[in-house]
């Protein structure tokens, strides 16, 4: 005669697995720590007509002295503040490496404001803009830093001053 197996151990195992899944599910869904969420950026309401024209940008770029012989400046990116007034264009030489100096050009809508630094700087990053400020991160090599990995870092915010000129809100790092 063949013995029948009891369903009790199988049911107990299934109940244990269900309980474990419930515990893990609660931990993953709301009882465990979650990293803080960032507020989404407001939608971009600026129009092309709020910024510099192509001709204004072309003239501003042409006025920047060439730093790499045999190359010319080209635009690599641009942006603006959320109030659509302060615009920036980042330029780099056509012959460049990771550490080739770059330049930022600022505009009050279609009026050129120039660059915040007299000389181009390598490793420039423009961070997400504020309502009326642009934050620029400058990096530089220190000691035996490799070209890929500068360890010097600092930021400064820029806005249009009451006189209509570009104004740094703090000192520009590594001048």
From Swiss-Prot:
Location in the cell: Cell membrane
Keywords: Cell membrane, Lipoprotein, Membrane, Palmitate, Signal
Lipid attachment locations (N-palmitoyl cysteine): 31
Listed Pfam families: Lipoprotein_21
Bilayer topology annotation: Lipid-anchor
Residues anchoring lipid (S-diacylglycerol cysteine): 31
Record-annotated disulphide pairs: none
Leader sequence residues: 1-30
Keyword Iron set for record: no
Entry coiled-coil feature ranges: none
InterPro entries in the record: LppP/LprE
Single GO cellular component term: plasma membrane
Protein name per the record: Putative lipoprotein LppP
Organism phylogeny: Bacteria, Bacillati, Actinomycetota, Actinomycetes, Mycobacteriales
Gene encoding the protein: lppP
């Amino acid at each position: 005669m063949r013995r029948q197996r009891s369903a009790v151990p199988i049911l107990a195992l299934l109940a244990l697995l269900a309980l474990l899944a419930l515990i893990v599910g609660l931990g993953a869904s709301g009882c465990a720590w979650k990293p803080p969420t960032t507020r989404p950026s407001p939608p971009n309401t600026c129009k092309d007509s709020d910024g510099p024209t192509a001709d204004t940008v072309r003239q501003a770029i042409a006025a920047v002295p060439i730093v790499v012989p045999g190359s010319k400046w080209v635009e690599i990116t641009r942006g603006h503040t959320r109030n659509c007034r302060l615009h920036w264009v980042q330029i780099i030489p056509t012959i460049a490496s990771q550490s080739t100096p770059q330049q930022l050009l600022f505009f009050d809508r279609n009026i050129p404001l120039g660059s915040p630094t007299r000389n181009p700087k390598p490793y420039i990053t423009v961070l997400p803009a504020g309502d009326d400020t642009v934050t620029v991160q400058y990096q530089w090599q220190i000691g035996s830093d490799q070209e890929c990995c500068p360890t010097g870092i600092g930021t400064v915010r820029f806005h249009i001053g009451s006189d209509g000129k570009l104004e740094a809100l703090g000192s520009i790092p590594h001048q």
